Structures are given as C-alpha cells and as structure tokens.
Curated annotation (Swiss-Prot):
Zinc found in the keyword field: no
Compositional bias of kind Basic and acidic residues: 8-33, 40-49, 92-103, 341-362, 405-434, 442-487
Biased composition annotated in UniProt, kind: Basic residues: 363-378
Entry protein name: Serrate RNA effector molecule homolog
Modified residues (Phosphothreonine): T299
Gly residues bias locations: 51-60
Subunit architecture: Interacts with cbp20, Dcr-2 and pasha.
Source organism of this protein record: Drosophila persimilis
Disulphide-bonded residues: none
Amino acid sequence: MADSDDEYDRKRRDKFRGERESYRTERRDERRPIGGAGGGRDEWSERNPFRGGGAGGGGAPRHRPDYSDYRGPGPRARYGSPVRDMPPPKRMRSDWGDGDGRPGPRYGGYDPYLMQAWTDHYQSMHSAYHHASHPPPVRELPIIGGDTLTQPAMLNLKQFLDTQDENISDSEVMRKYTEYKTDFKRQQLNEFFVAHKDEEWFKNKYHPEDSVNRSEEQRGFLRRRTDVFVELLENGTIGSVKVDSSHGDALIRVLDTCVIKLEGGTDEDLKVLDEKPKEALVFDRKPESVDPTTVVENTPKSPKKEKEEDELPLIVSPQRIALKPVNSDDENWDDAEVEDAPPKKPEEEEPKESEPIPEIKQKQKKEKKKKIKKRKRNSSSDEESSSSESESSSSSSEEEEEDDEKLKAKYDVEDGLRAEQKAEAEKDQAEAAKAKLGSVSPKEEISPEKSAADPEVEGEAKEDGKQAEKSPKSDDEKKQENGDAAKVESAAEPATGDAQGEVKPVTIDLDKVNPPRDMHRTSSIFLRNLAPSITKAEIEALCSRFSGYLRTAIADPLVERRWYRRGWITFTRDVNIKEICWSLNNQRLRDCEMGAIVNRDLSRRVRPANGITAHKQVVRSDIKLCARIVMNLDEKFKLWSEGPLSKPSPASDSEATAANGSGSSYGFNSKNPVLQNITDYLIEEASAEEEELLGLSGDRKDGEGEPIERDEQLLSVLDRLVLYLRIVHSVDYYNHCEYPYEDEMPNRCGIIHARGPAPSRVTSNELNEYIKSYEGKLLQFLTKTALLSEDQIKDLGAKNADTEVEKFVQANTQELAKDKWLCPLSGKKFKGPEFIRKHIFNKHEEKVDEVRKEVQYFNNYLRDPKRPQLPEHPGSVKRPETESVRGPGGYRPPMYTPMSGMPYSFGGHMMGGGRGGRHFPPARRELPLEHHRRLVGYHDLDAPSNSDIFD
C-alpha cells in the first residue's frame, strides 16, 4: 500500500506541476535535473530529487525544500484544497494607502470610528437579523477600489419587529422604529464629528473661529482677483479676446496675464509673454547661462587679449586667459589694468601683482559658477566689488600717474588727502567725461570703478556671497569712512573707461535692467497620500527650507480614500524639482509616506466645448445663466459690498428673502461692471408677425434644421461673463464645474473650456434639449446654499450651550465627603457645590468658553446640508423584493452568515431560518406587516388532534 500511496501522491503532484511552475518561476530551473535530457517531459525518477543519489540523470543529490512548502505544515492532506494549487491572486497596489489594505485600524494604528467595537456589538445584538443580500460587516468587506468605509447596517422594519414584543400595535411599532432610525442617525453624526473634529480640514469648515478666518482669506483672494479683472477690463484686454477654441493663444495670454498680476508682477513682467518659452533653465545649465554675455564681450576685448599675451606672458597664466570669456567684467578690467603697469615700474609692481595671482586662481576655480549666477541675477555683484575697492592693491591702474594716485589713496587714507590731489582728481575726471563718446550718468561712472576692484579683494567679497547681497549699501558706507578717497579713485578710472568704452554700456545694461520674470510658470510636486491629521503648517515648514518654495494647496479628504488628502507644493520654475521630490520621498511626516511625485505641466489649457453653444438662442440662455451665477457668487462673498462676510442663512430666511425680492437683481443696481445693462440682452426677439403673414411654419425647420446663427454683440457680452466667472470665481462655465482652492494651486488660471467648432445645422429640438440639460448641470451654482433651520438640527441632535455648560460644571463637581467637595480642574476643595460653580466661572472661564465653542462647532456641522459623513451601508438601501429574496443577479444568496457563525438552519429556535435565503429566524415574520397581527386560522374537524390550531 505504501507504493500505491506514493504512486497516487506522485500523480497528484505531477498533475498540478504545470500550474505550480507557471507562478513559481524561481523554482522552474531547480526542478530540472542536472545532466538530464532537455525537451519533452522527463521521467518521474529523473525529476524527483528525493529518489536517491542515482536519480536525476547521474547528478549529485540536490537539497531542495520539501513539498510541504506547497502544502504548508501539518499532516499531508490526501485531497488538498484546489485554492492552494492555484496561482496567487494579483494584489493591486494602492497609490495612497500605506498598510495592509484593510479598512481598520486607520490613521496610524488607531480607529477613531470604533468600527471594530461597533461591529462586535452589532454582531452580538443582531447576529440573527443579517439579511442574505446584506454585505458582510465592515472588517470583512472586500477591498473595492480603496478602503471605502460605510455606516453600520441599520435594521429594516422586519428585522426590527423581531426584537419587539409580539403584542405590540402597529402604531407603536412605527413610532419606535422612527425613533430607532433617528437615534441611529444621531449616533452616526456624533461619532463622525468626534472622529474628525481635531482635523484641520474639518475646522476650516465648521469651527467658529477657524472657519471665519478661512472665509476671510478666501474673500481676500477673490478681491485680489476682482481688482485684476477690472484692470484688464479697463485696458481692453478682456474685450479683445473671444472665448472660442480657435482663439486659444489669445485666451492663454489673458490667463497668463492674470496670473502674473496675481503674483505681483508689473507691466515689465508681461513682456515675458512675448518671448519664446525657454526649454533649458538658466540655473540648471550653468555654462550656457552666460552665452549672451560672452558673445557681447568677446568682440571689444579681443585686442586686449592679444596685448596681454605679448606683454605679460609670465604673469597671466593660460587658465586666467581661458576664464576671461566666461567670467564677469571684473576680471577683464583687472587684466586690462595689469598689462600697462609693468613697463613703468617693473621692480615695484611685479612683486605686488604676482602675490595675489595664486590666490586668484584658486578662488576662481571654486567660485566661477557662483559669480556667474550673481552677475546674471542683479547688479549686486558690482556693488560688492565697489565696497572692496578702497582696500585693493595697486594692480588696478593702467598708467603710472594714475597708479601713483591710487596708491596714495589706498595707504594715505588715515592721514587724509592733500588739496592738490583733490584738484588733480577733479581735473582728470572732467577730461575723462569729455573724452567719452556717449553721455554717462554719475551712477554709470562708478560702474567701471566697481568692476575694477582688485581680484583678491573681490574673491573675498564673493566668498561672503549672501552677506554682500543682503547689505547692498556697503559701498556707500565704505566711501563715507574713506572720506574723499573715492573721488581720487573715480578719477583714476576714466582712462580705463576710454580704452574699453564699448563694453561698459553693455555691462551696465546687464546689471541694471532686470529681465522679465517668468512668474506664470511654476514647478510643482504632487503629494498623493496625506493623512487627515497632517496640517498645512507642517507641510509648509517641511518645504520652506527648499529654495524657490511658493505655496501649498491641500485638497479636502474623500471618503473613498479613507479621508486621506492630496496636496500640491508649488516652487519657482528655476528649481531642481526632481531633487526636491527625491528629498521629500525620503522623509515621513507623522509616520506617513506622502508619495511625492513631480506634477507635469498642463497639456491642453484651452479645451473645446459643444459647438452648438455659439447659436444665438443658446447664447441668450447662457447669458441668463451666467448672470444668475455671478449674482449668487458675488452675494455669497460680498465682493461688491463693504459689509462683513455673512454666512448662508437658514432655509426659512432665504425663502422669505427670495419671496420679497430683496436679493440682488439684474441691471443698473449692480456695481459689478459685467452686470450693468445686462437686461438689454436678455429680452428675446422673434419675427413672429412676418412668419405669420408669410405662412412660414417651424415644421420645415425642425425637419431640416437651421444653420448656426451667431450674434457677435451677444457673444461679446457672454464672453465677459464667462471670463469673469473663470478669473474671479474659478468657475469654468462651459465645463459646468468649479476649480476649488485655485489660489493655492500651482496653476492659478490653468484650464478653460471654450466654444468648439459649430455644426452646420441644428434642429430646434436639439437646441431645447441642450438648454434644458445644461441648466440642470449648473444647478449647483444657480441655487443658493440654505442652512438647516433650528427645528431641523434639533431632530439631528443639536446641543444647547447652556445645557452643555451645566453638564461641564456637574462633571467637575465631585463630592468627597459631607461638606467637602473637589474641583478636578484645579484640585481645590470647597465646602459646597455652589462654591465650585463660582470657582469654575471665575478661574476657569476659558474652559467654559471652550465648551460653548464646541457646541457651536457641532451645531455648525449639523446645519450644513452637504455635510461630510460616511455613506450608508448597502444593506440599509431599499431594494426590490425579488432582488432581496433571490439576491443580486437572481442567484440564491449563501446559506451561511458572513459573521463566522453557525448556519441559520442549525437547531433550536433557528429552525425557521435558511428557507429561501432569509436569515431572520421566526418564519411568522415573513408575512407582510398587515398580516403580522391576529391570524385567522382554519380548523378541520376531521384533522388529527395534534394539528396546529390558531386562536
């Protein structure tokens, strides 16, 4: 029998060998015997490594894991489960979750919803009432597109009846069931509030203080956008563009202009829109960043380069000559000064000039790229060299007389200068000014003096770097300390300026004229996974240490993402965004992997909408809808009024306001320029009399259709409204959506939808259907948000501030003994509870205020008709009777409970369950409600005596 068992087990393993090999590729090579014949199926004796040393084609016995690896530990099962031999199911990777993919515990190891305890409690109390069509409890739900949590399943009416007394009346049942549903909803709202009340996104919505601050911040953003729009409307930028997909470039230019204005840019910065976008960033490619400067400087300085090679071959090294084209003007001016000095005083000048040369070479190698950046960025580099000019050596002169004067100015500063030196300096300065070809301002005369600073001192100034940039006034302070020495130095420089007069204006232009800033283009990082407990301040503190950081935007959480949020971090365009992204990926915030990736630029910024929108009838309808949306949003944020921002009123107040007509209205009363005289374009016109006289009917038009009729005047009015909604309120009308928190996003005005190519003909039915359907899509903007009334929130469990304060006082009043009471807040003891009450209101007033704010916080959450909450359990949703009995798809539901309990048809009082897939035990409850009371039975006189007899 042993051989028979082995043979059976061999065949069983051989049968599933192919399936095992298909998903265990790492063991496929190990199963092949060493030296065995390739191709075809080998004999079992050759393939089996456990048959001894002679098996396997002459190879040595190999040590392989036992087949228990496939079966698992324990005794060998003769008929194993087929699941064990099947390939493992594919595990989908979640982009935003970090955990085992189960709903709980969440948020780093704790479960704020207490879903585990609730499920256990619900299983113990209602284990017999799970309907067959109900999904399993939350902890056993399959992962479907993310960890979507739901509320616990609420008992339906039939399940609730089984928990009540049999003699209860119908009215009492309905009353108790209504109370049960109300209490259930209150409990869910309260649990959700307790779970999320400490999170930033929840506070920004409902906290009495944080929500007001957030609303004021948003109102400030809108006011800034309004100012930009009015400015563009007045200068004709808005009126010169059409919201058509064929005018995409003009639309993009308008949006970019708005972004530059919102970023604080000037009209000079708008010139960047006329330039071609640069593919390579300046600071990413350092050698290429100075190409324009190098080309300009090469032409006038080529004679000087040849002269240097002839006169000073020993002093000027080949490295220094090679650095001339790419370095700033400082080194070039120094070279020009060095070349003329040795013929006059070789004994004195050469030792002084040769000393700083090795230091210059070392510093130039280290700080070459640093100097290029500073020369390209602003004119602070020249100011740094000017501040160190008074301390430089005598190597900055061209002629002997000028060099002598400069030496005296350097070393005789403490003793002062004589009057003769001052007169000579003024005379030389006047002659140099006349010799110049172009008129140079006094500020420009100092620029060659700045660039002629000693290389050694300049290198020291460059080492200071940021300190020199932060103190641009250092050159003025040096001049004040040195007295009139600056005058002598400025007199010594014009001769040098004559020799290189062509280069000096170019250098001044590069330093003084700030290039237009590319403010409408940014680099950004997308954070896929942010826990609800992470605040915006923590993200800002983490990213502010990177250069070029601008702002952070965090989206509202989504229930299908386990209330995790997404974020966008915006940087300037010139940063190395990939390096920053790599740094963020190596960091964890509150034990949460943020999942940072580089956010790509927008691909299509102007996207086409239906071309039927250009028809005159549709345009007039769109003007009405746009005007209503503009009025609602302006009134919501009080953009054109000076009053404080008010919250939406309750439903009763808003209805009364609408009935009285006291709200905003079309026409001349509005301060909004896009709404003025809007009524002139809202009146429809038709040639009704002409059609009647000529006998024209609309039947032929409906059959054949009519061509698209464009009215440019109406289109211009509509374009102003559409652009106002897009720029000010971030509402894309032709996409019937709003782009939230756009002022914090990387692209403040990124995408807009415009009218696409129009069809040749359109029927009236298509027009009417389009107008009707589009109005339904915009319903969220057309209706005002009405908060729930006081009576409505009372049904949801609203709290009273005085009642909660009283509960707070009672909770902090503890009786220790007779006439001995304790206040836990302070630890003090009192003789009576009334003294503790006074003590709490006097000494712990901030605690009482927190209780009142908490009550207002909770009530604000209840008033919101669109409040966030967990979705209802699928089992609580009403379904057709056929589906509930037979299960989804018409198939019979499983006979066992999903809660790991015994089958419902197992013994005792549960004998009535299981029939037809119903899982609630008493069979008598399967009848309709009206038949649950007082059943009239039929008693057959001929029946046996042990038959059932109804009363």
